[in-house]
Swiss-Prot record:
Required for the maturation and activation of urease via the functional incorporation of the urease nickel metallocenter. Residues 1-51 are annotated as: Disordered. The lineage of its organism: Eukaryota, Viridiplantae, Streptophyta, Embryophyta, Tracheophyta. Keywords: Chaperone, GTP-binding, Nickel insertion, Nucleotide-binding. This is Urease accessory protein G. The gene is UREG. It comes from Oryza sativa subsp. indica. One of its GO terms (biological process) is urea catabolic process. Belongs to the SIMIBI class G3E GTPase family. UreG subfamily.
Amino acid sequence: MASHDHDHHHHHHHSHDDGDHHHSHHQDGSHGGGGGSWVGEDGRVWHSHDGLAPHSHEPIYSPGDFSKRAPPLISRRFAERAFTVGIGGPVGTGKTALMLALCRSLREKYSLAAVTNDIFTKEDGEFLIKHGALPEERIRAVETGGCPHAAIREDISINLGPLEELSNLYKADLLLCESGGDNLAANFSRELADYIIYIIDVSGGDKIPRKGGPGITQADLLIINKTDLAPAVGADLAVMERDALRMREGGPFVFAQVKHGVGVEEIVNHILQAWEIATGNKRR
């Protein structure tokens, strides 16, 4: 492989209504489809996937505490971007099904728009369109590339752009943002999500809540989905409830079967309660 003697310095600066972000990328002669890693000028380790935009990750030293989670931003201007609900969780837990259920529950009384994240396709957005969740023009699908969690935490501009645009186009009351499926360490930045939902399911067994991770411990609401599968996989819901309450210091969680509508009304109530508190609006 040919060597490269030159350096590349990339500086991106973008500001949001909640503050400024400055990303510095410093790459020393590392090229190629497989990406690579290097130490940036900021002292953080940066990497890229398959030639995609470089990014770094905030170090995570512990699963965190519910009581010490980042609070909603005080400086938020909802006229510029409506109250945003972030929905995260591992692959296959029911994020897109929840997006569909929330759209169906809220669209009659509230102006909604949705942004979905997939790694290399627009499948989740297409699913919502196919099932008539919202008019097609109110749904945007974003391809995040190899690190979907970076798009909801370290470099949120890929999501902020379409969310702000949709919010202004449709005078949205609520925005829904679904992350790409990821691991238990992924969680939304408060600069992107005013209310954070993390969804797991029982198919991984009843050990998942106690494994923790920022999503499980620090989301505003934890959803344990597909409870109807518990007997088939030998998952004990009582154990999951105990561990969820312990890991989340009593923070709220909902047992659900989103596909069958079980628990959806309770989830909607949690969202609207947070929306009322943040915006000063009354539910309709």
